């Protein structure tokens, strides 16, 4: 981690020390970029695993947007789902269903972020079946009524966040070479 830089009070020694400091600064930026990339990859991997557990998983994509800047590194994990619209109903967002669940049958335990974010079982606008064991819905593709118990919340983004929180010290030590 710490790197000692020695110098004397000569012009050449001071210039060498400045050069070493600039190299150290540049290496810190590269290490910060690597840390952010590794943490984002860790989160993306966990999010994809949890998305794939849902029958709606094929409607969701996850990507990392990175924006390295001078002496700053950041990455944003972005999940995008499908919006299903139907006449006389509010839009249904597959990402929200996978993150927070739909229906009480599979979701007796809510996503821990639900109260903070205002989502979860029973919060879908105009919902009337959230606290029932199951319900029928009209499937426009097959033009039939289908029975469902709803969608289990696999919480991909919440679990990605938790994984990053659990792993950041370990990964930082690997990147920066600490013990």
Show the residue positions of the predicted features.
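Short, Lys/Arg-rich flexible segments
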Residues: 1-89, 93-94, 100-179
């Amino acid at each position: 981690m710490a790197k000692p830089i020695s110098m004397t009070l000569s012009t050449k020694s001071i210039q060498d020390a400045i050069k070493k400091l600039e190299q150290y600064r540049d290496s810190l930026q590269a290490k910060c970029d690597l840390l952010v990339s590794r943490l984002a990859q860790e989160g993306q991997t966990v999010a994809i695993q949890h998305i794939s557990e849902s029958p709606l998983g094929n409607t969701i994509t996850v990507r990392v947007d990175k924006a390295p800047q001078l002496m700053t590194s950041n990455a944003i994990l972005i999940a995008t789902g499908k919006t299903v619209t139907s006449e006389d109903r509010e839009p249904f967002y597959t990402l929200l269903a996978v993150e927070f669940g739909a229906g009480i049958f599979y979701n007796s335990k809510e996503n821990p972020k639900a109260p903070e974010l205002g989502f979860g079982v029973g919060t879908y606008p105009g919902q009337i079946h959230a606290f029932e064991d199951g319900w029928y819905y009209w499937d426009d593709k097959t033009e039939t009524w289908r029975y469902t118990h709803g969608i289990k919340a696999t919480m991909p983004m919440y679990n990605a966040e938790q994984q990053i929180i659990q792993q950041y010290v370990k990964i930082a030590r690997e990147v920066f070479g600490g013990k």
